[in-house]
């Protein structure tokens, strides 16, 4: 009798585990990424540069990741010749940023259960966050190079090192890779991030608005690709995450 009872318990456990297959997700994730970005600041000419990032993610749900991310890269603009900048201004900023952001994927708000199309688009996301960026000018032209603009003793105002508050806006798509437990073990993300900063630190210049174009907050943008490994506690979701059809 004990033998049959044990078999019954094991069968029930197996059935319940199978019933939950595809509904579960991991609570945490850790990842890294690469980026390709440029600035939108007081200097018209901008140079694209590669960058990178590391992140720790709390998965509030399979479709709402909340991440603390360390980002780094280079923002370069202007030039010391008139064809690149009228005043010979040039800066190269090796920046570092710490950002807290959250993304909302369509799968959180749509019913995709019986639609192959919706199962594909459920991984599109939009998000926002808040953080701080540390600006450090590796190279910057502080004095006027051309006398037709004024005396060569003129010093362009600004700081070579500064910290600014930043707000990133994020858009993209996440490819989910499932493990042997039918949970999202890994993700690959393709995205775009546009960040607004509160201050004039990205290019190191804080010029007089009456003489120079300086009518918008400094901004920078990047295209990103990221990889994330999920781990930790297994949590059950209200909808089927994996489509078995």
Cite the ranges covered by each PLM segment:
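Short glycine/proline- and aromatic-enriched beta-strand/turn motifs that initiate or cap beta-hairpins
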Residues: 19-59, 228
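Residues that define the transmembrane beta-barrel architecture of outer-membrane proteins
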Residues: 26, 46-52, 94-98, 122, ...
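Residues on the lipid-exposed face of transmembrane beta-strands in outer-membrane beta-barrel proteins
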Residues: 32-36, 54-58, 100-104, 128-132, ...
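Short loop/turn motifs that connect adjacent beta-strands in outer-membrane beta-barrel proteins
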Residues: 20-27, 63, 108-122, 177-186, ...
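Extracellular loop and loop/strand-boundary signature of outer-membrane beta-barrel proteins
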Residues: 38-42, 83-95, 114, 152-159, ...
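Predominantly the C-terminal beta-signal and adjacent terminal strand-loop region
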Residues: 176-245
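Structural signature of outer-membrane beta-barrel domains
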Residues: 37-39, 73-77, 107, 131-137, ...
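Gram-negative (and chloroplast) outer-membrane scaffold detector with strong preference
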Residues: 64-150
């Amino acid at each position: 009798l004990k033998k049959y009872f044990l078999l019954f318990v094991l069968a029930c456990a197996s059935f319940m585990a199978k019933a939950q297959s595809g509904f579960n997700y991991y609570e945490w994730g850790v990842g890294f990424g690469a980026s390709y970005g440029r600035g939108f600041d007081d200097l018209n000419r901008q140079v694209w540069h590669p960058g990178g990032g590391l992140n720790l993610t709390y998965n509030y749900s399979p479709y709402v990741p909340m991440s603390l991310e360390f980002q780094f890269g280079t923002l370069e603009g202007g030039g010391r010749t008139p064809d690149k900048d009228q005043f010979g201004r040039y800066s190269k900023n090796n920046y570092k940023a710490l950002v807290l952001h959250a993304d909302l994927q369509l799968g959180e708000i749509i019913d995709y259960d019986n639609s192959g199309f919706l199962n594909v688009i459920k991984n599109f996301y939009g998000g926002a966050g808040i953080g701080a960026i540390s600006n450090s000018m590796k190279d910057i032209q502080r004095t006027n190079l051309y006398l037709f603009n004024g005396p060569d003793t003129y010093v362009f105002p600004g700081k070579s090192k500064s910290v600014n508050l930043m707000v990133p806006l994020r858009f993209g798509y996440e490819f989910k890779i499932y493990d042997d437990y039918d949970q999202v073990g890994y993700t690959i993300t393709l995205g775009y991030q546009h960040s607004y900063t509160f201050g004039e630190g990205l290019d190191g210049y804080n010029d007089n608005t009456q003489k120079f174009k300086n009518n918008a907050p400094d901004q920078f943008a990047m295209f990103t690709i990221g990889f994330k490994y999920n781990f930790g506690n297994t949590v059950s979701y209200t909808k089927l995450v994996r489509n078995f059809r």
